[in-house]
Amino acid sequence: MATGLRCDGAARQRERGLIVKSDIEAVVRSADLAGWKPVEVEYGTRSFPVLVPGDSRILEMNEVAPLRDPGARMRAALNAPIGSRTLPVILLSKGKPASELTVCITTSDITRPVPYKGDSGILPPLLALLHGAGIRRENVTLIVGTGTHRPSSPAEKVTMFGEDVVAHYRIVDHSCDDAAALVDIGRTASGTEIWINRTFYEADVKIATALVESHFMAGASGGRKAVCPALVSRKTIERFHSAQFLDSPLATNLVLEGNPCHEEALEIAKRCGVDFIVNTVLNRRLQLLEVFAGDLVLAHAKAVELLRSVVAVPLDEEYDVVLTHGGYVGINHYQIAKAAVNALPVVRPGGTIILAACERDDDPIGPLTYRTLLHLLKLQGPRGYMSALLNPGWVFTKDQWEPQMWAKVLDKVGEEGLVYCSAVLSPKEHLIVPGRAGWDYLPADAPEDEMTRARTMLQNAIVYAVKNPRRRGAVPRVAFIKEGPYAVPVRTPAAVRHEAQLISG
């Protein structure tokens, strides 16, 4: 049974609402949790238990065994590509001796755990295959596809690729702002100017490598995303991340068909002439599940098919209260948006999302531009923020897309419907963060230990959301997304049809 809440002073109580705060105190003091069951909630690299109602739905991903011999599977995938000729045959089709061909391999940066080095890595068998077909080492260039990210450090290159590759191959970082390193190859059907990395575009053989995971804007990573946004100009990236594209309901997890972000990136990747891709799918322990090599479209589609079978969680109804967490990837508020967006299919309109956050980054919220835009969202609300972004006079601002994702969350549950439980952010920092602060749920004698404090605020938030007297005796339906940002709840066709009938009837 929870204890009384802290009093932060009259001004603080007026700001957050004295009546609501008193409600919280009364509810957590008197809550009877008989019949509730424990669930383990991830908190950064650790976890802790909290209690949820005994009939709560646990939403979890499928467990898929990793490959027993990932190195052998990597070699087999390269030698039997999907929808494509083998690399040696592709080299023969280029019209000049293999010893004269230039090869460019685009890679992810340090923010993505792509298996590049070692016995189970992409690069050793890929490079061996190229050299065995006559490609000279000095004619191979690795381009780190940074998008708008910073260049990779020498130490990061060793971490990603291994000392041998770093010592013997040319490795460069893409720069989205270096005009001399970009080439204009026209416009997309939607009018986007395509400025692409010159080294990649002018190479005789273009190979794109990546990890395929769910992406809450482009549907899935990998495939075409190794070119756009990874190897294009800032101006092209701004279009890819534009408010107009992201405003589409199809710009979401695991959706490719009709997704404007996916279609734009795919058109750009096709235009620049990708010859071959190597994509991987990992489990949450970063173990290799499968390798997909070959055609830009077909091999990537197979990877997404496997990904969907692993991360998609069938959902037949919406819930009043949804508990989730930021996971290991949630190093700051910017990254934790993934977990909140993944909860959207689960929560009913006007429901409650309770989010456990463990920000471990030096800047627990995010960069200055993100903070500024987040504050704008806080002041104007989701509709006001979107109106600003969609206004013809709006000047594209870096990071504007992430508050747009938070706006989608607030548009469904409201400011009070998002409970952001962070023991890292101070109450002052919470003033610019959307939602209700977990600090409002702490008892007066809250422990100083961060882990215990986080667990206490989360438990009290759950108790209040379930036992809130405003429910007038109604028993709320509760769901827990066990894997947080990694799981992708997907409405079943029956659920979608039922919802459509309710709306029309």
Name each model-derived stretch.
Residues 297-363:
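Active-site segments that bind and position negatively charged phosphate/pyrophosphate groups
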Residues 166-318, 346:
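Conserved, well-structured core segments that form the ligand-binding/active-site neighborhood
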Residues 119-192:
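Well-ordered mid-protein domain cores that form the structural environment of catalytic cofactors
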Residues 87-150, 323, 336, 340-354, ...:
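N-terminal active-site beta-alpha-beta segment that forms phosphate/nucleotide-binding
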Residues 52-93:
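An N-terminal, well-structured beta->alpha segment
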Residues 17-60, 71, 416-505:
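Extended hydrophobic packing segments that form well-structured cores
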Residues 333-420, 426:
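C-terminal catalytic subdomain
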Residues 50, 60, 114-115, 208-209, ...:
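Short helix/loop capping segments that flank catalytic or ligand/cofactor-binding pockets
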